[in-house]
Regions:
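Hydrophobic alpha-helical targeting segments used for export or membrane insertion
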Residues: 11-16
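Generic, low-specificity signal for short hydrophobic/alpha-helical stretches with a mild N-terminal bias
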Residues: 4, 33-36, 316
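Bacterial N-terminal signal peptides that target proteins for export
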Residues: 1-10
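Thrombospondin type-1
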Residues: 22-83
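Solvent-exposed loop and capping/linker segments of extracellular ligand-binding repeat ectodomains
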Residues: 22-25, 70, 74-583
Length: 583
């Protein structure tokens, strides 16, 4: 017993010595933090630092509450708490049966982690976020609940930090500049493409997708799909109109197909979608809005519907690679489409080194390329810019039944070699041949036939430097001053109408002119009418020698006799015979 007591005393002394030695000599080189109380979303926790050698407790620290982490429904992913924002200020709408959000009851620039706009307040629905409601607020996530259908203009004015945004399927109207001054990290839309098409955006700064770093939309499985990974969109027939700015920011789209039932494509609907290569429009579509496909620089193929009536200005501006247009209607319908400006025509911005191909359905309902244009006899008017930049078009025939031709109808038709048309100009007040070409007659054009000319006006063929042959018939009675002046490649002209006078310098400087046919109705050659026609070889006068000699000549270069080698008149048998120029 005595020995046991002595052993216990010795052991106690030794342990005391060890701990005293550690406390005096341990440098606490290895420590660790040990959690005593875990922090929750709302409660602080605690932890202490301890030496791993001597286990001495060196200090304690508070663990701050974690805060809620909300999903896109405003439910905390850790504790299940449903977000509410008591600081939201509401205002009763004029209908007295719904509320709108008008602000936050916090000091300016105060930080709030997550704001969830509820669907109800005071047992009435919340339907709207008012103008400037969240101006100058600081938060990192905004969740807008289902049932809210409108966000007023400038709702996030001066919100110059990055946030996440959750938009409900119910949203139907987003006013001007809602996202003009905001940086969006992630945008989540709780609806499908079809639902998205029902949102009305007032301007480009109303659409959040173009402002977001990442954006997501629900797919057919009701799962979020990153918009950046969507390559093809099919617009369902339940959508009557694709709204303005609808797909602004959907940069990954490569193909768009419109189902039967869609009638209109709004302004800037697909503007800036630079990866789209093909657009297929349903035959129910009647109009394409301003800048609808502006900046679609990869677009090569377009299928246009048979019922299209109007293509607004700049609809295809900066679509520089369009080479194939497939039209599902008849040629007479194409002539009646209203192209508001040059960039309404899908070929206008095409790189001039590319050949454009325009296809129409033939009798077998198969696409056939149009290279030789014959306007149907039931067409009365050809609208402006209808065939602009059809640079693979080789020939054109327009019947006398056409009464009006719009401006720039054939501008940019750089492969055109011959054209037959009823009049010079537009058929009304414009009387210049170059009018239908945007005053840039293609250098490829060699042969022109006018079948029902009402007049041949002053400088009517100005700029036709490459045209080689012109035939004119109709009821015109005079060839006005300088009508063909400077047509330096013109080598043959036939005048079949009952012209009475060929006026001043009408053919001056037509230095390649070798042959001309003149009607017997001519009574006068004006001053210098044939000045410098140095290549003139044959003159065919459709009258007798007596009629030829009776023509009034104003000066030496008025008459083709000054240059012609041979002049022919009709004999009694109505056959050409050469006359002696010297007698």
């Amino acid at each position: 017993m005595k020995l046991r007591n002595i052993s216990y005393i010795l052991l106690t002394i030794m342990m005391t010595f060890v701990f005293t030695s550690c406390n005096n000599k341990c440098k606490h080189k290895e420590t660790m933090w040990i959690v005593d109380v875990n922090a929750t979303c709302t409660e602080n926790g605690s932890k202490h630092e301890e030496c791993t050698i001597c286990h001495e407790k060196l200090g304690t620290k508070e663990i701050k509450a974690l805060g809620h982490t909300y999903d896109n429904q405003g439910i905390c992913t850790r504790c299940g708490y449903e977000s509410t924002t008591d600081e939201i200020v509401y205002e009763l709408n004029p209908d007295n049966i719904s509320y709108k959000v008008v602000g936050l009851r916090i000091e300016k620039n105060t930080f709030v982690s997550t704001i969830k706009v509820p669907s109800e307040y005071n047992n009435l629905p919340v339907t709207e976020i008012g103008a400037n409601a969240f101006s100058d607020c600081y938060f990192i996530k905004l969740i807008i609940s289902e049932g809210i259908n409108k966000i007023d203009k400038d709702a996030f004015n001066y919100l110059r930090h990055s946030i996440d945004l959750v938009l409900p399927k119910s949203i139907a109207n987003i006013e001007e500049n809602v996202f003009g001054d905001i940086y969006l990290n992630n945008v989540y839309y709780n609806g499908t493409i079809e639902d998205w098409c029902n949102i009305k955006f007032s301007n480009s700064a109303s659409n959040p997708i173009s402002k977001a770093t990442n954006s997501y939309i629900l797919d057919e499985n009701n799962e979020y799909k990153e918009i950046a990974k969507i390559s093809e969109i099919v617009i369902p027939g339940t959508i009557n109109r694709i709204g303005d700015y609808q797909f602004l920011g959907f940069d990954s789209i490569k193909k768009v197909t419109f189902s039967e039932g869609v009638k209109e494509i709004g302004n800037s609907a697909f503007a800036g979608c630079e990866n789209i290569t093909k657009v297929e429009m349903a035959n129910t579509i009647t109009s394409i809005g301003v800048s609808a496909f502006a900046g679609n620089s990869s677009l090569t193929d377009i299928v246009l519907p048979s019922n299209i009536k109007t293509i607004e200005s700049k609809a295809f501006t900066h679509c520089g690679n369009v080479t194939n247009v497939y039209y599902n209607g008849a040629l007479e319908d194409w002539c009646n489409i209203e192209f508001i400006d040059q960039a309404s025509n899908p070929f206008y911005y095409n790189d001039r080194n590319l050949t454009n191909h325009f296809y129409m359905l033939n009798k077998n309902s198969k696409y056939e390329e149009l290279t030789k244009l014959v306007i149907p006899s039931n067409v009365k008017k050809i609208n402006s810019r209808t065939f602009s930049d059809f640079n693979n078009l080789e020939s054109i025939v327009i019947p006398n039944t056409v009464e009006t031709i719009g401006e720039q109808v054939f501008s940019g038709c750089t492969s055109l070699t011959n054209i037959i048309l009823p009049f010079i100009g537009d058929g009304n007040n414009i009387n210049k041949f170059g009018y239908i070409f945007g005053n840039h007659v293609p250098s490829s054009l060699k042969e022109v036939k006018i079948t029902d000319a009402k007049q041949i006006a002053e400088r009517a063929f100005s700029g036709c430097k490459e045209v080689e042959s012109i035939t004119i018939d109709g009821v015109a009675t005079s060839i006005e001053d300088e009508a063909f002046s400077g047509c330096t490649k013109l080598n043959k002209i036939e005048i079949l109408c009952n012209i009475i006078s060929i006026n001043r310098q009408a053919f001056s400087n037509c230095t390649s002119l070798t042959s001309i046919t003149i009607p017997n109705t001519v009574k006068e050659f004006g001053h210098g009418a044939f000045y410098n026609c140095t290549s003139l070889t044959n003159v065919y006068f459709r009258g007798t020698l007596e009629e030829w000699r009776s023509i009034r000549i104003m000066n030496a270069t008025s008459t083709p006799e000054s240059y012609a080698e041979h002049i022919y008149v009709l004999d009694k048998n109505n056959e050409y015979v050469e006359i002696d120029i010297n007698n």
